[in-house]
Amino acid sequence: MFHSDSAFATLTSQTLTHEQKLMNLAKEAENAFDVLDIPPRTRHFFETGAINDLFEGHAPYRPRYILPDYGAFVRQGSAFLRLPPPQDLDELLFSLMTLYRHVPSITNFPVYLGNLDTLIDPFLDGWSDEEARRKLRLFLNYLDRTITDSFCHANLGPAATRAGRLLLEVLAEVQNTVPNFTLKYDPEVTPDAFAEAAIRCSLACSNPALCSHPANRDTFDDYGVSSCYNILPIRGGAYTLTRVTLTRLVDDARGVEHFMEELLPECLRLTADYMNERIRFLVEQSGFFPSSFLVQEGLISADRFLPMFGVTGLAEAVNHLLRDRGLVYGRDGEADALGVRRRSTPW
């Protein structure tokens, strides 16, 4: 259903920028469609807030998170963007800035900018540190001023590089909000001095975070840390992210057994069905994959995307179910046991 009052409020807002108005009005138009097959019981869980689509909208027309293969882009350029493979640092940064403008996501901005140090390092020959820092400063400030959403991520490491060192120096200096950075840390590869430089930088500007490269490198053949620290396959990403909010679901429970054996399994099954329906529409009807130059040029592939599922409110749900007995999650053993209890019969 189209909500004209909400759209008009967006249209006449004096607090939103022009770009924010465009995105909000587009969301109003998207939500006017009813193209997904959603059964009544699933709609009930949406109405109560037990299932949350995290602002993905009623008619998915792009994946939630996209992680292009920026290395392939640098090697081959882009016919669609009429960009040849970059030959020097200026061309590299210009090419990346151009491509970022064309990488969609749920936020309408790129959520992943690549392993910037390994992309940049081969192009630093012939530039002094000061010259390179000036170019990187302009590059990072461009990202911060044009990607106006904090769910955006760049990666470093695990190996130390000159580009990585310079990026850390500039990050600490500019104190920008966007993008977030994560260092892929591997004790067998990452020198202590580089890890210490990353920690000092993080103390100065809250970037980069650190992730365990050994713990994550075998999950996918190549991965990136994207958006709000989501680890996903390069050349793919996440089709969708749907969350179950236990604090809302528990309001429908008649007791512990009803919640564990009936209500929670039903909600999870319907959540999975809903995610499948979103993916079906996105892949089969939206036209995104047949039309995107990111697909045509090999920067992403539909078989590299996966669904994401979230859950929140565990402690609150346990406390609600055991409130009559005064048991509290994190303090009482029986409450903690309920938090990790499995259904008694197979799913």
What is the meaning of each model-derived region?
Residues 2-303, 324, 330-338, 342-346:
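Conserved catalytic cores of very large enzyme subunits
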Residues 316-324:
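Well-ordered alpha-helical scaffold segments within catalytic/enzyme domains
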Residues 111, 301-317:
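Conserved phosphate/anionic-ligand binding catalytic regions in large, soluble enzymes, centered on
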